[in-house]
């Protein structure tokens, strides 16, 4: 009977231990939940206290460590967050969140080399974590490593095509490399996602600057085209000529009408202005898409839509009168898949 007694005693002990462990886990989850709610209310010290209670019960809690770091960063103490993030990474080495936040902290603290180190470590650990590619693109851009910024932005777009900021950093990086056609299509892609946000006017300013690059109206019927020496052998060469010819024989055009004609003419030669022979992604995702758009009959609606931040009242009135055109454009967007 002694072995049986010992077995029963052991089973009872295990049952008690499992129950206690389960209760502790539930308590930790509840404390973290309370901490998150307090953080959302801006009660950062109270939130941190809740996380500290959770960590006393379960020091190996990934969520408690990560949320502590998140709240410390929100509180304005990002460097204090790093030890908690390092702990979180040790607990879950394949999670991209921790690497991403540490990278952000170092980048904000003007330590780009450390930021790049953690973004790269994060990419190695979590290769499908989209924000790592976006953030490393931003850091590369800040370091004037525009080729690397473009490449990372492309990966970020592949992982999340609807992430407007990735479209934006692609447009900025290509612009810095004087790839004006690719930059134009990047900005237009951004504006398809964010036609009316605080960032939209800046994007539209870039678009207009690219379209008007080298083109100067010198009189009512005269235009001067200036070709920069660095554009003589590049994909930018045809852009000012195309833009000028698009409206040269037209009269009494509104700003949006002119823009529509200019967009259409440029998109029709999208593969030329992007010089995408050696960049399959740009050729498929950008050039093919915008070339199809130019031929779709939806250019007026497209132009009105992406220029809402500049001509809001006029464009909204146009959409009210042309609701079928807006619906047709929306249907076309849904039906037209952008390939990588």
Predicted feature locations:
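Short coil turns that delineate tetratricopeptide repeat
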Residues: 59, 93, 127, 161, ...
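Alpha-helical segment of the N-proximal tetratricopeptide repeat
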Residues: 26-60, 67-74, 104, 108-111
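Register position in tetratricopeptide repeats
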Residues: 40-41, 74-76, 108-109, 142-143, ...
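Canonical tetratricopeptide repeat
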Residues: 33, 67-70, 100-101, 135, ...
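Helix-start (N-cap) detector for alpha-helical repeat units in TPR-like alpha-solenoids
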Residues: 27-29, 62-63, 96-97, 130-131, ...
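Canonical positions in the second alpha-helix
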Residues: 53-54, 87-88, 121-122, 155-156, ...
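Eukaryotic alpha-helical solenoid repeat scaffolds
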Residues: 167-340
